[in-house]
Curated annotation (Swiss-Prot):
It comes from Brucella abortus (strain S19). ATP binds at S14, L15, G16, K17, G18, I19, D71. The active site is at C380, H514, E516. The gene is pyrG. This is CTP synthase. Catalyzes the ATP-dependent amination of UTP to CTP with either L-glutamine or ammonia as the source of nitrogen. Regulates intracellular CTP levels through interactions with the four ribonucleotide triphosphates. It is an enzyme of class 6 (ligase).
C-alpha cells in the first residue's frame, strides 16, 4: 500500500516546494523505494498552456502531451521517472470534470457543492493509479491562506482521516526571515502560518524551514513548542549553490530519516548518495567554462526557460565545464548590431517562443552564427527562424516569413492543419481554440544516417517532445537544401521537417522539438552535451 506525503507552503510563495518534493523523492529513491510525485495547482486555468510565460514560467510538456507546471520538470530531472497527464491537476480541470458529470446526470439530481463533490474529485486524483508505488508525494500549489487553495487543503485533510493510520504525513515549508535591524531570524511568520494550517484541521508532522543562515537551536526549540512539532522534525532548509545540492543538504539535515520515522519505518534502508555526490562534485569543480548567449523574448523571467537552463548545465556536467549564460533580449538586435553582443560568446542558442515580437532579432542571431561559424542551437521557434534566415540570405527569397506573423507571400513557416499521431490523423482549424490544440507530446523522427545529428544521437530513430502549432513548410525544402541547409530529420511520413543542419558549419543544428524536456543531470541530453562540447572548441578560437 502506498504512503502519502502532502507538502504545503506558507508565509510567501516561491519558497521551493517543487524542489523540496523532488529532493525528498530522490532521497527516498536512493533508499530503494518506488516514488511518484503529483502537483495540485489551485488556479482556474485548465492547464498552463495558454498562460503568459511571465505569469507562470515554463510550460513543461510530458510524453503523453500534457501541458503542465514547471515543477514536473524538477520531478523528472531529480527522479528520472517520466511524468504524465495524471501527475498534474488544476482547479480548472477539476471543475470541468465536475460540470461534465453534472451535465451527464452522474450526480442524480444532487446539488453540486465544493464539499463533497470538488473535494471528492481531488481525492480521487490523489489516490488513483498508485498501486505500483511505495510513496506518493503531493505538492499543493500556492500558499496556505490563499482562497483558491482551500478545496485542496480540505481534500488532503479528509484524506488524513480516511487513509489507514500511519500512511499520511504532512510537511509544511515555511520561511524564517532575517531582520538586519534586529540581527536575528524571526519565528513568528512560521508560527502564524502553522496556526492558519491547523485552523483548517491539518497539523504538520514536519516543518521544513527556509533560511539564509543557520537556525539557532533555541529557535528550533521555539518552533517545536509553538507549532506542536517534534524538535527533530524542525528541519532547516538553508540556501545552497545549486538545486542539485539540495538532496545532499536535506539528507544531512535528516529530512528523509524524519519522514520514514513519521511513517514508523525503522530500521530503514541506507541511502546510496554516490551519484548525487558525483554531480555536486562536478558542479563545484569544473575544469573550464564556456559562455552561451540565449537570445530569447521572455528573458525578463528566467523561469520561462527553466528546463533549457538545466539542460545547458547538464551539458556542462557531461563536459566537466561551467556554463555561463548571457541573456539577450532578441528585440535588441532589431535596433543594434548583434556583433558586439555575440563576438565573445562560445555558442548561441535561440529557444522556443510564440509571436512576431523579437523574431527579426532571432533571425539576425542565426545569420551571425552561420556567417561567423559560431555554434548555433535553434529549438522550435529557433529552428524556424534559422530556416527563414537561410531562405532570405541563401536562397534569395526576400519576403520569406512565417504565417504566424500575418499574411505572407512566402510562408517558409506555416500553420500545421493536420499530422499523424500514431495511426490517428490529427486536424486543426486556423480559427480553433488555443488551449491544448498544438502538436503536443512525444513524436517519432527519422534522421539521415550520414547527418551530424544522427551521429550525436547514435541512432536514426528518435522520440522527442513537441509543443508547436507552426512548422517549416515542406514546399521550400528542396530550395533550402540546394542552398546548403540539410533537412536531416523528418517525421516518419516525410511530411514534417524535424531537424536541420549545415554540413559546412562546425555545429549548426535546429530542431522542431524540445530536447531540454528530456535532459537529466545523470543523463544529459546528447544534443546539449554535444553543443557544449562544440562551445568548448569555439572557446579556444575566441
Amino acid at each position: 500500500m502506498a504512503r502519502y506525503v502532502f507538502i504545503t507552503g506558507g508565509v510567501v510563495s516561491s519558497l521551493g516546494k517543487g524542489i523540496a518534493a523532488a529532493a525528498l523523492a530522490a532521497l527516498l529513491q536512493a533508499r530503494g523505494y518506488r516514488v511518484r510525485i503529483r502537483k495540485l495547482d489551485p488556479y482556474l486555468n485548465v492547464d498552463p498552456g495558454t498562460m503568459s510565460p511571465y505569469q507562470h514560467g515554463e510550460v513543461f510538456v510530458t510524453d503523453d502531451g500534457a501541458e503542465t507546471d514547471l515543477d514536473l520538470g524538477h520531478y523528472e530531472r531529480f527522479t528520472g521517472r517520466p511524468a504524465n497527464q495524471q501527475d498534474n491537476i488544476t482547479t480548472g480541470r477539476i471543475y470541468r470534470n465536475i460540470i461534465e458529470k453534472e451535465r451527464r446526470g452522474d450526480y442524480l439530481g444532487a446539488t453540486v457543492q465544493v464539499i463533497p463533490h470538488v473535494t471528492d474529485e481531488i481525492k480521487n486524483f490523489v489516490l488513483e493509479g498508485n498501486e505500483d508505488y511505495d510513496f506518493v508525494l503531493c505538492e499543493i500549489g500556492g500558499t496556505v491562506g490563499d482562497i483558491e487553495a482551500m478545496p485542496f487543503l480540505e481534500a488532503i485533510r479528509q484524506l488524513g482521516n480516511e487513509l489507514p493510520r500511519g500512511t499520511a504525513v504532512y510537511i509544511h515549508l515555511t520561511l524564517m526571515p532575517y531582520i538586519p535591524a534586529a540581527g536575528e531570524l524571526k519565528t513568528k511568520p512560521t508560527q502564524h502560518s502553522v496556526k492558519e494550517l491547523r485552523s483548517i484541521g491539518i497539523a504538520p508532522d514536519i516543518l521544513l524551514v527556509r533560511a539564509d543562515r543557520e537556525i539557532p537551536e533555541s529557535d528550533r526549540r521555539k518552533l517545536s513548542l509553538f507549532c506542536n512539532v517534534r524538535e527533530s522534525a524542525v528541519i532547516q532548509a538553508l540556501d545552497v549553490a545549486t538545486i542539485y545540492d539540495v538532496p545532499i543538504a536535506y539528507h544531512k539535515e535528516g529530512l528523509d530519516s524524519e519522514v520514514l520515522s513519521a511513517f514508523g519505518i525503522d530500521p530503514a534502508p541506507k541511502p546510496r548518495m554516490d551519484r548525487w555526490e558525483e554531480v555536486s562534485h562536478r558542479l563545484h569543480n569544473p575544469e573550464g567554462e564556456v559562455t552561451i548567449a540565449v537570445v530569447g523574448k521572455y528573458t525578463g523571467l528566467k523561469d520561462a526557460y527553466k528546463s533549457l537552463i538545466e539542460a545547458l548545465h547538464h551539458g556542462g556536467l557531461a563536459n566537466k565545464v561551467k556554463v555561463n549564460l548571457d541573456w539577450i533580449e532578441a528585440e535588441v538586435f532589431e535596433r543594434e548590431d548583434p556583433a558586439p553582443y555575440l563576438e565573445k560568446v562560445h555558442g548561441i542558442l535561440v529557444p522556443g517562443g510564440f509571436g512576431e515580437r523579437g523574431a527579426e532579432g532571432k533571425i539576425l542571431a542565426a545569420k551571425f552564427a552561420r556567417e561567423r561559424k559560431v555554434p548555433y542551437f535553434g529549438i522550435c521557434f529557433g529552428m524556424q527562424m534559422a530556416c527563414i534566415e537561410a531562405a532570405r540570405n541563401l536562397v534569395g527569397i526576400e519576403d520569406a516569413s512565417s504565417s504566424e506573423f500575418g499574411p505572407t507571400r512566402e510562408p517558409v513557416v506555416g500553420l500545421m492543419t493536420e499530422w499523424l499521431k500514431g495511426n490517428m490523423l490529427e486536424k486543426r482549424a486556423a480559427a480553433g481554440d488555443l488551449g491544448g490544440t498544438m502538436r503536443l507530446g512525444a513524436y517519432e523522427a527519422v534522421l539521415k544516417p550520414d547527418s551530424k545529428i544522427a551521429q550525436i544521437y547514435g541512432s536514426t530513430d528518435i522520440h522527442e517532445r513537441h509543443r508547436h502549432r507552426y512548422e517549416v513548410n515542406i514546399d521550400y525544402k528542396d530550395r533550402l537544401e540546394a542552398a546548403g541547409l540539410n533537412f536531416a530529420g523528418m517525421s516518419p511520413d516525410g511530411v514534417l521537417p524535424e531537424t536541420v543542419e549545415y554540413a559546412d558549419h562546425p555545429w549548426f543544428i535546429g530542431v522542431q522539438y524540445h530536447p531540454e524536456l528530456k535532459s537529466r543531470p545523470f543523463e544529459p541530453h546528447p544534443l546539449f552535451a554535444s553543443f557544449i562540447e562544440a562551445a568548448i572548441e569555439q572557446s579556444r578560437l575566441v
